[in-house]
């Protein structure tokens, strides 16, 4: 994570690398249905073989909230949150290469 509050002098602010490679990440100020995280900065990481949620409110100490894998995972590529932050719509880039019966 890079702090660009002063664009002419970007500063390293922290890193989260506990779940391997991440293809795409969406970070939001959380306003979804779980009130425990309201107002916190939460990132949804689409991490090759999982969906991982990380609280980065304290950039120097990011905390993994969950890691989810799913049947038939091939390459968790990207995703989007619904406007109410109730649903994450996930795109697996390579699951089409597997037949439904395998």
Describe every region a protein language model picked out.
Residues 1-102:
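Feature marking well-ordered beta-strand scaffolds used for ligand recognition
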